[in-house]
């Protein structure tokens, strides 16, 4: 048997403050916040977009409370999101939202060809790349 994965369903981001992170991803990137309680007293905040989601895990959570990778650090992620919006419109939106544009628009290499990317950081310092294919 050979195995070939086909898509990313979700990922977990370790954050200092779930509310601050969720509000930023809602306001800046237009994601939908969904809060669930998989077991009594254990709330999980997820940010939904397209067919994916990001679970926001508080860095203070223990492995028993929320099983995750061995190294837990907020602000260590580097994520690229795709959009159909024009790159300059993305940069303008970020600035209008009070978010500093670190770089871009600039051409980069994406998984399926050339993308035009705009870079910023989320409240924890993770690098956020917002891109569109040429």
For each of these PLM feature ranges, what is it?
Residues 62-67, 103-104:
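A short, acidic/glycine-rich surface segment
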Residues 2-4, 46, 91-134:
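Vicinal oxygen chelate
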Residues 20, 86-91:
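Short, conserved charged micro-motifs
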Residues 1-20, 77-79, 133-134:
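N-terminal beta-strand motif that seeds the catalytic metal site of vicinal oxygen chelate
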Residues 13-61:
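Core segments of cupin and vicinal oxygen chelate
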Residues 43, 75, 114:
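Exposed loop/turn and edge beta-strand positions of beta-sandwich/beta-sheet ligand-binding modules
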Residues 69-73, 77:
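Helix-adjacent hinge/juxtasegments
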């Amino acid at each position: 048997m050979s195995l070939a994965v086909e898509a990313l369903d979700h990922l977990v981001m370790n954050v200092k403050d779930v509310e601050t992170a969720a509000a930023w991803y809602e306001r800046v990137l237009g994601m939908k916040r969904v809060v669930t309680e998989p077991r009594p007293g254990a709330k999980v905040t997820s940010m939904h977009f397209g067919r994916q989601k990001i679970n926001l895990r508080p860095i203070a959570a223990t492995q028993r409370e929320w099983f995750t990778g061995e190294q837990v650090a907020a602000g260590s992620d580097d994520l690229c999101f795709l959009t159909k919006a024009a790159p300059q419109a993305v940069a303008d939106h970020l600035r209008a939202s009070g978010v500093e544009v670190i770089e871009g628009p600039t051409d980069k290499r994406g998984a399926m060809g050339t993308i035009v990317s705009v870079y910023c950081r989320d409240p924890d310092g993770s690098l956020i790349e917002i891109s569109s294919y040429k």
